[in-house]
Amino acid sequence: LIVATLIVAGLTLSQLHHQVERRVAATTQNLVRSVVQTFDGLIDSLDVALASAAAEIEHENALHPGDTAAIDATLRRRQSMLPIAVQFRATNAQGEIVYGDETPFPHVKNADREYFRMQRDNARQGLFVGKPIFARIASKWMWVFSRRVNHPDGAFAGIVFALVDIDGVVEDRDFFEP
């Protein structure tokens, strides 16, 4: 009788263990799907905001060349519409950051950055999602998203880019809430 009880208890524990493993696996898969959807949504939002900002910068530069206040306001509007803290900036064709909060940055050029080169060298690039970089101005790790800005004749005029603070996203619990 004792042996039978031990066998039944062992089988029951084994079944419970497998049930817990299946539930943990299902919960983990659901969480991963949720995080992927959240990041996909963020990337889509950034793409729309950057495309819109690039179009507005092109329009402003065509109508009012050198009007930094209007372009700075455009960038502030675009970044305020996003669900996380993002810094929007824009460069001229030489890679100098000339638009965005806290500009100008006279000694900071982004011409050597991959995201700048990709936009400069590829007129049809669209959204470029770069590898995380250590930002020179913010002095922290950032994820960079960029789009090309053109002159009215289609020539390269610079880029508009968004810097997403990686630590800020990880620490923002509200960002991951459904």
Can you annotate each of these PLM segments?
Residues L1, D40, D44, W141-R147:
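An N-terminal domain-start capping segment
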Residues V3-P65, R76-I84:
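Juxtamembrane extracytoplasmic/periplasmic/luminal helical "stalk" adjacent to the first N-terminal
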Residues S52, A70, N92-G95:
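Short alpha-helical linear motifs
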Residues H64-P65, A70, V170:
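Polar/charged, Q/E/K-enriched amphipathic alpha-helical segments with strong coiled-coil propensity
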Residues A62-G66, H151-G154:
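Short, glycine- and charge-enriched coil/turn segments that flank and shape catalytic ligand pockets
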Residues Q79-Q87, A93-F176:
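Extracytoplasmic/periplasmic ligand-binding sensor regions of membrane-associated signaling proteins
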Residues T68-A73, D112-R113:
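Structural motif corresponding to alpha-helix initiation and N-cap regions
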